[in-house]
Amino acid sequence: DIPTDVLLGLRKESGAASAVGRNAFSRYTESQIPVVGTVRAGYGALAFEEDYGKEYACVKDPENYFFLVVKGDSMEPRISDGDLALVHRQNTLDNGDLGVLVYGADGEGTLKKYIQRGNSVILHPFNPAYEELVIKGEELDHLYIAGKVVETKAKW
């Protein structure tokens, strides 16, 4: 355990605690991560744009992350229109993860809670005004996982 006053920088670290503290976070660096476009918090297009800027994030492997600007209100009250979603590039999600998913022949992209039940996947919005999307059978062949949402940032 690292004392609170050391974590807050009120006291210098010493002995074994200092080595543990440094090693625990040494793989994480604050990096500029590209904001590559927008994603619907609803059901719609996943739009990638060339130059949307950069945001800082503290991650282990910055080349495997990107930010998207959230559009829509289906993930309210936890994720709002205009928030930034930090996404880790990966093609699998665990049950209950928030993910950026592309679904359908038109390649509609969305940010939703991923729920797997038996042989179906449910894309769950937090906002009760929106319905869940249930994907099953051969429809699952048209579901692509772009990544896992690991953090969101609100802009004020």
Give residue ranges: language-model regions.
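Short, positionally conserved secondary-structure boundary motifs
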Residues: 5-81, 95, 105, 109, ...
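Well-ordered beta-strand positions in beta-sheet-rich domains
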Residues: 84, 111-113, 134
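SH3/SH3-like beta-barrel fold
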Residues: 123-125
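Low-complexity, intrinsically disordered Gly/Pro/Thr-rich segments
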Residues: 128-139
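Short glycine/proline-enriched turn or capping motifs at secondary-structure junctions
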Residues: 137-147
